[in-house]
C-alpha cells in the first residue's frame, strides 16, 4: 500500500482529429507494444469506415455504441464465513466506460474480418445497433448480477 495515497489521475488529452477524449481512450486501448501511430491509424480508419456506412458523425456512433455496451451492474467476489458469494454492485461511470472500451476492442480482435480496421468498425456499428458480442457481454454481466441479487446485502 502506498503511503501517500492513490496516484493522481493524469488528464486525458483530446484527440487531435475529432477533439474527443473517448477517441483518445479507444486509441490507448488498441495500442500494442507502444505502436501508437499504428493504433491511431486503426482507430481513425475504423471511424472513417463507420462514417462511410452510416453517413453520420463517427464520434456520435461511437458514443451510442458505448452507451449500449456500458454495464450498470457487475458482480464482485466477497468471502463470508468460508463461502464466496458473487455480490452485485453498481459500476462507477469511469469504470463502465473503461469496461465498454475493453470489451469493444477485445471482441473486435476476435472477429473474422480481414483487417483490424474493418473488425473495429463493424463491432462499433453492431454495438451502436444493439448487436454484437460486446453487447451480449453486457447482457450476460447484467444477468449474472440479477441472478445473484439475493446476496446484494453483502455489498460493501
Curated annotation (Swiss-Prot):
Record's keyword terms, sorted: Ribonucleoprotein, Ribosomal protein, RNA-binding, rRNA-binding, tRNA-binding
Pfam families the record matches: Ribosomal_S7
Any GO MF annotation of the entry: rRNA binding
Coiled coil: none
Claim: Ribonucleoprotein is one of the keywords in the record: yes
NCBIfam families: rpsG_bact
Subunit structure of this chain's protein: Part of the 30S ribosomal subunit. Contacts proteins S9 and S11.
Function: One of the primary rRNA binding proteins, it binds directly to 16S rRNA where it nucleates assembly of the head domain of the 30S subunit. Is located at the subunit interface close to the decoding center, probably blocks exit of the E-site tRNA.
Family label: Belongs to the universal ribosomal protein uS7 family.
Record-given protein name: Small ribosomal subunit protein uS7
Species name: Mycobacterium leprae (strain Br4923)
Lineage of the species this protein comes from: Bacteria, Bacillati, Actinomycetota, Actinomycetes, Mycobacteriales
